[in-house]
């Protein structure tokens, strides 16, 4: 099942409605959000249908309770650390580490993401993200862009803490959440394009840590909430930092992240905030 948040183009809705996509139609769900739908707070209203061409898709979870972004692809870890003269620590193989990102800075498909102030090295990061359901288990998957300001991040992390301002200005999610009965997050081609040019390619199956390990580590000594986001981390070659060509994003660039079985998340880089 493909779930979404959507707004009919002829209506001005602040948050949108939850829906289920079937072919070229969207069926509205009798719930306020996908989080409430996951907890059993809604069902399909068969009479509230819209043509997919007549709606705008929104971020499937507009303000998640939390965003944990993991570090699950060995190629990305190895290349990123090698650029700083570092090896992959043994502990990386033992635990699926993560950092917390900013739930208040989530963007949906087709939205312009403001170019952050004080950076000259804006980067995309190609990731798969799990969305937690009402039972604390993974309910489905979406595409995630963990936007990064590399020069800010580089400065901050010299202190031994972070990332902070190098990351918390934007995370994009979308275009849909595909439930685990249709997509289990074990494989699928991952591609990033900038202005139509392919820049990155990898596969979900290259993850070192499993989704079970990621979910269980996230839940240890705490409680996962409906709508929590668990990012996979960047696939190998899935960011400009890793490519090493210095072709950083500029205002007006169109970034498309595509994951086989999930969809295409497209955003335009906006003007400086």
Q: Whereabouts are the PLM-identified features?
A:
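Glycine-enriched loop-and-adjacent helix/strand subsegments that border the catalytic/binding cleft
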Residues: 61-215, 221
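Generic structural signal for buried aliphatic residues
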Residues: 128, 230-231, 255
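A conserved acidic, glycine/proline-rich C-terminal tail/linker
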Residues: 210-249
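N-terminal non-catalytic cap/leader segment that marks the start of a structured domain
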Residues: 1-96, 254-258, 273
């Amino acid at each position: 099942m493909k779930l979404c948040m959507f707004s009919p183009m002829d209506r001005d809705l602040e948050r949108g409605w939850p829906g289920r996509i079937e072919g070229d139609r969207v069926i509205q769900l009798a719930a306020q959000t996908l989080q409430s739908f996951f907890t059993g707070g809604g069902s399909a209203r068969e009479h509230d249908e819209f043509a997919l061409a007549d709606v705008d898709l929104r971020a499937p979870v507009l303000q998640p309770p939390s965003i944990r972004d993991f570090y699950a692809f060995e190629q990305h870890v190895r290349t990123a650390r090698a650029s700083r003269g570092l090896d992959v620590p043994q502990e990386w193989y033992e635990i699926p580490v993560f950092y917390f990102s900013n739930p208040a800075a989530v963007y949906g498909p087709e939205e312009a993401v403001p170019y952050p102030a004080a950076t000259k090295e804006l980067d995309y990061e190609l990731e798969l993200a799990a969305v937690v359901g009402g039972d604390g288990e993974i309910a489905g998957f979406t595409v995630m862009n963990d936007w990064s300001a590399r020069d800010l991040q580089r400065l901050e992390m010299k202190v031994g803490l972070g990332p902070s301002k190098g990351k918390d200005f934007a995370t994009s999610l979308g275009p849909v959440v595909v439930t685990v009965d249709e997509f289990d997050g074990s494989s699928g081609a991952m591609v990033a394009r900038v202005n139509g040019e392919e820049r990155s390619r990898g596969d979900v199956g290259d993850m070192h840590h499993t989704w079970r390990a990621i979910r269980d580590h996230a839940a240890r000594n705490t409680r996962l909430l409906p709508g929590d986001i668990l990012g996979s981390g960047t696939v190998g070659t899935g960011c400009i930092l890793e490519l090493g060509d210095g072709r950083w994003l500029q205002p007006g660039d169109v970034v498309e992240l595509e994951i086989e079985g999930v969809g295409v998340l497209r955003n335009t880089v906006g003007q400086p905030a």
